[in-house]
Amino acid sequence: MRASLLLLCLLSIGYTQAQIDTVVVRVDSMFESKLHRKLYDNRTNVKYHLDERGNVRDIFVFLATLEEIGTGHKLYGVRIDQRFNRAIFTDAPASNAEYIDEDELPKFIGYLKMIRDEVMKNDHTPQKYTEYRFYTRAGIMLECYTGVNRWRCVLHYEIAKMPTDTYISNPERLSELLAVMEQIQAEIAENRKRK
């Protein structure tokens, strides 16, 4: 009897894993404050849906929707992560998910546009090293260095408590990331209209 039950559980888990490409159980920022207890007490009742929204070279951008227990209201966050780190996305409670909350998207997109249109093209003090830093609520940092006739842009965030840097150091890559962010913003707005 126990062997049959164990086999049934393993088959169920295998089927579920075949249907889910990426699962995040620990979430931070807006999800943490509102649903922290529910996430740990009722994991099976929380629905995760992550869609890959384009490959920005070695950056993956995800749109994650989390359905709140009871009301079914969906909260949105954008996750940024590097390629080849999917093994970290397990149900291990130590795994951190860094999100840009949906209400911060316009500000984040504005920062990217500022870097593209002003910082990158109009370095007002080319002989002086200048640094720009922008933070999201969850702690993701968008950092840009300029000066001495060169510039670079980097995203700082953490995966499983380990600091991670992803460089966006050419105009094409920056424009591609900006386009993906704008696409996600439009998609969230469209989803909100349907409710």
Where do the PLM segments sit?
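Positively charged, low-complexity terminal tracts
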Residues: 19-195
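Bacterial Sec-dependent N-terminal signal peptides
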Residues: 1-22
